[in-house]
Amino acid sequence: MIQPQTHLNVADNSGARELMCIRIIGASNRRYAHIGDVIVAVIKEAIPNMPLERSEVVRAVIVRTCKELKRDNGIIIRYDDNAAVVIDQEGNPKGTRIFGAIARELRELNFTKIVSLAPEVL
């Protein structure tokens, strides 16, 4: 579960290393975001000489959470970290590579470009 003020790792090579969630896109007063939700975040740590800089406000989609994800078939998936991928207004990733495993639920939410770049889909 991701809420405002939560720090997340960045799972792509867009230039950001760490994000902090500011807002959850969707309803006006949504408390928590889960895998596949789009958030508004600020970059807290960035790689030097890259397009994205520190204190820049971006949109990101959550790809991994420490909180368990329960599927309809009874499988429970839990990751070691909270991670997101920086996206543009159309929902395409700003980076060209994705690091780490991502959940299959992103394919159902029409983030097919992120799924195709990922090395492993669970």
Curated annotation (Swiss-Prot):
Primary location class: plastid
Tagged with keyword Ribonucleoprotein: yes
Gene3D superfamilies: Ribosomal protein L14 (2.40.150.20)
Highest taxon in the source lineage: Eukaryota
GO CC annotations on file: chloroplast; cytosolic large ribosomal subunit
UniProt GO molecular function: large ribosomal subunit rRNA binding; structural constituent of ribosome
InterPro entries: Ribosomal_uL14, Ribosomal_uL14_bac-type, Ribosomal_uL14_CS, Ribosomal_uL14_sf
Any one Gene Ontology BP term: translation
Keywords: Chloroplast, Plastid, Ribonucleoprotein, Ribosomal protein, RNA-binding, rRNA-binding
Localisation: Plastid, Chloroplast
Pfam families: Ribosomal_L14 (PF00238)
PROSITE patterns (UniProt xref): RIBOSOMAL_L14 (PS00049)
Keyword presence, rRNA-binding: yes
NCBIfam families listed in its UniProt record: rplN_bact
Known function: Binds to 23S rRNA.
The protein's assembly and partners: Part of the 50S ribosomal subunit.
Family named by the database record: Belongs to the universal ribosomal protein uL14 family.
Annotated protein name in UniProt: Large ribosomal subunit protein uL14c
Protein source organism: Nicotiana tomentosiformis
Gene giving rise to this polypeptide: rpl14
